[in-house]
A protein has these predicted regions:
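C-terminal hydrophobic helical "lid"/dimerization subdomain
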Residues: 1-3, 290-338
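Glycine-rich beta-strand-centered segment in the early N-terminal region that forms part
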Residues: 23-39, 52-98, 137-139
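Glycine-rich cofactor phosphate-binding loops and adjacent beta1-alpha1 units
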Residues: 164-175, 200, 210-281
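Residue-level marker of beta-strand positions
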Residues: 65, 83-84, 99, 125, ...
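N-terminal Rossmann-fold cofactor-binding loop
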Residues: 202-206, 238, 286
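NAD(P)H dinucleotide-binding glycine-rich loop of Rossmann-like/cofactor-binding domains
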Residues: 93-179
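Mid-domain Rossmann-like dinucleotide-binding core that forms the NAD(H)/NADP(H) cofactor-binding site
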Residues: 82, 140-225
Length: 338
């Protein structure tokens, strides 16, 4: 099989991912072997490649938004043979810690993550735990489905953590802010608008991100540091920029919630207490549960969500990550593998 391996973390401009021939994979008990068709690129992949997330697995193969077909199965996983499946960030959890037992497996004490602690989908094949994959809805091709498997699922969980669903009217009529409008943002706006929210988008790049936000029905679009015209009931920061936290808090109405949607984010500057006062809340998103993924994919199929993608070949992965780093991708980037 062919795979892109990271020999040592380095700026992506130095092209640290190397396409190599590596031994073929054999699934063990409870595992499946997936022929990769497409793999989305994510800012977390960039954090792995450039070393902002520490090296856990030497020569790791990145990639955690994988769509493909099951071509092999270990004992106990044979029922998935021939199925189209999606593989996300959460590779496996321990199942026995107090967080797993309590229904919060996203906070597992001993998790494994696709493309970071175990090999991911920047390859022609991948192994996955059969209990942690998703069956893909028929309405989505593999290329279109790939960004749903992290950007979509994390966006869905971030929307849940806003607490807007708990309002008497739910999302209907709520004012939601989105800071950053890449892969996750352009999916989250579709879910929020389908639920009836008015979405205010603060993001860079007029030609790409702001224009796409307008196409997808944002109530208002401005620059990353612009102040929205109305106080927000909740906001999500998808950009990995901690310096946006004070601005996000300042944009909230009383009792509002600011959700930090990234696995990695730069440090926040000091936050004046007056920005937190009147019961404003800041909370982070930590991974996702399998139920998040199942519920999101079902809702995405009902709406239906449309992913806007820019495709690259497997051998172009370094170029794809450079494009992601420089905000040159409108919507989501996807490696087409087969």
């Amino acid at each position: 099989m062919r795979a892109l391996r990271l020999h040592a973390p380095a700026p992506v401009e130095t092209r640290p991912l190397v396409l190599e021939n590596v031994p073929d994979l054999t699934p063990g008990p409870g595992q499946i072997l997936v022929k990769v068709s497409a793999c989305g690129i994510c800012r977390t992949d960039l954090h792995v490649v450039e070393g902002e997330l520490p090296v856990v697995r030497p020569l790791v193969i990145p990639g955690h938004q994988v769509a493909g077909t099951v071509v092999g199965a270990g004992t106990g996983a044979e029922a998935l043979l021939g199925r189209r499946v999606g593989i996300g960030w959460l590779h496996r959890t321990c199942g026995s810690c107090r967080f797993c037992v309590g229904g919060r497996e996203n906070l597992c004490d001993a998790p494994e993550f696709t493309g970071w602690t175990v090999d991911g989908g920047f390859a022609t094949s991948i192994l996955a735990d059969a209990d942690f994959v998703y069956e893909l809805p028929d309405g989505f091709s593999d290329v279109v489905a790939a960004p749903l498997l992290c950007a979509g699922i994390i966006g869905y969980r971030a929307l849940r953590l806003t607490g807007l669903a708990g309002r008497p009217s739910g999302f209907r009529g709520a004012r939601l802010g989105l800071y950053g409008f890449g892969a996750a943002g352009h999916i989250a706006i579709q879910i929020a608008r389908a639920r009836g929210a008015d979405v205010y988008v603060m993001t860079r790049d007029r030609e790409r991100h702001q224009a796409l936000a307008e196409e997808l029905g944002a109530a208002w679009v401005g620059g990353a540091r612009d102040i929205p015209p109305s106080k927000l009931d909740a906001a999500i920061i998808f950009a990995p920029a901690g310096e946006l936290i004070p601005a996000g808090l300042a944009a909230l109405d009383k009792g509002g919630t600011l959700v930090l949607g990234g696995i990695h984010m730069s440090d926040s500057p000091p936050i004046p207490y007056e920005l937190l006062y009147q019961e404003r809340v800041v909370r982070s998103v930590a991974n996702n549960t399998r139920n998040d993924g199942r519920e999101f994919l079902a809702e995405a199929a009902r709406i239906p969500v449309t992913t806007h993608v820019r495709t690259f070949g497997l051998e172009e992965a370094n170029d794809a990550l450079i494009a992601l780093k420089t905000d040159a991708i409108r919507g989501a980037g996807v490696l087409v593998v087969a």
